[in-house]
Structures are given as C-alpha cells and as structure tokens.
Amino acid sequence: MEGKPLLTSKQKTAVVCGVPTQVVCTAFSSHILVVVTQLGKMGTLVSLEPSSVTSDVGKPVLTTKVLLGKDEPLVHVFAKNLVAFVSQEAGNRAVLLALATKDKSMEAVKALQEVIQACQVW
C-alpha cells in the first residue's frame, strides 16, 4: 500500500542569536511535535490545545499546559508566541512543544519562528 507516510518529519540546524539551535518538526495525525533546543536536550514539554471558537474573532484560543519541566508563566507566554502559527496553519491542530533554549527574547522568538517555518510538515 503506497501513500502518505505515517510520520512526516523535518529538521534544521541554524544559529539563532549567536547560539547553535536544532529544530525538529514531526506531524502526527492529531498533533504536531516541535522540538526546539539550544542545549542538546528536550527540556520543557508544553501542550498547546486550541479551544473551540465561541466568538466572531475566528481564531481559537490556545490553552497551554506544561507536561514536563518548569511550569513558569514565561514558559506559557514563550510557547504561545513561538508556535501559535503552527496550530493555525495546521488547521487548528494541537501542538506539543519541547523547548530548551538559552535566549527567550522576542528577537529569539522571531528567529526561531523562521526556523520552525522552514521545517513545515503540516
């Protein structure tokens, strides 16, 4: 039986704000897994689930939940800013984000978004 592979995965290495960074994106049937590391490990695992749209805004709200690692407010903000576009572009699928970064500035978020976009599997 030929057809679409069960898993689609892409990876890219780039220098983000002077730090070597690896990004791996893998598409599963119900989730997109995004691994972003500058430390060579998976780090904090965050689940981003889209909620149902109840207003005329049109975009679902992403609910974040730290599954593994430090559950700090900055982690939730960073995760939403980093991968909200992945969920939207993937038809509002849930995203699992594994995050181990040194730099959590907005400059780093924008640069990391470009690397994630280059690994598009959705």
Curated annotation (Swiss-Prot):
Subunit description: Homodimer. Interacts with PSMG4. Interacts directly with alpha and beta subunits of the 20S proteasome but dissociates before the formation of half-proteasomes, probably upon recruitment of POMP.
Membrane-crossing residue ranges in chain numbering: none
InterPro entries in alphabetical order: Proteasome_assmbl_chp_3 (IPR018788), Psm_Assembly_Chaperone (IPR053720)
Function recorded in the entry: Chaperone protein which promotes assembly of the 20S proteasome. May cooperate with PSMG1-PSMG2 heterodimers to orchestrate the correct assembly of proteasomes.
Top-level taxon in the UniProt lineage: Eukaryota
N-acetylmethionine: residues carrying this PTM: 1
Family, per entry: Belongs to the PSMG3 family.
Lineage: Eukaryota, Metazoa, Chordata, Craniata, Vertebrata
Biological processes annotated in GO: chaperone-mediated protein complex assembly; proteasome assembly
Keyword Protease applies: no
GO cellular component terms listed in the entry, alphabetical order: protein-containing complex
Protein name: Proteasome assembly chaperone 3
GO MF term list: molecular adaptor activity; protein-containing complex binding
This protein's UniProt keywords: Acetylation, Chaperone
Pfam families per the UniProt record, alphabetical: PAC3
